[in-house]
Amino acid sequence: MTEESHVKTRFYCYMVRCANDAFYTGWTTDPLRRVAEHNGGRGARYTRMHGPVKLVYVEQVEDHVSALKREAQIKRLGHARKAALAEANPLSEEFKG
């Protein structure tokens, strides 16, 4: 086995702020790549219509299932609670791109 095969995939739940001030929530294995996709017109239909987007929140989770569950939890929050979540959890240097 190669050294690379021992590297565990990281999963993240993320939130971006769209140009219309709305939040879009999703999950990914690479938040910076995913934001670039959203801004390059290769993301979700919503972000293509309301871009550009800015990464405002990233949370690492255990696995794919956890990412989906956390995404659903965040999507149920209202706008003010999403804004508070982003404000209370500043991006680490790794994701300031």
Question: What residue spans do the PLM features occupy?
Answer:
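GIY-YIG nuclease catalytic motif and its immediate N-terminal context
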Residues: M1-A44, R48-K75, H79-A80, L85, ...
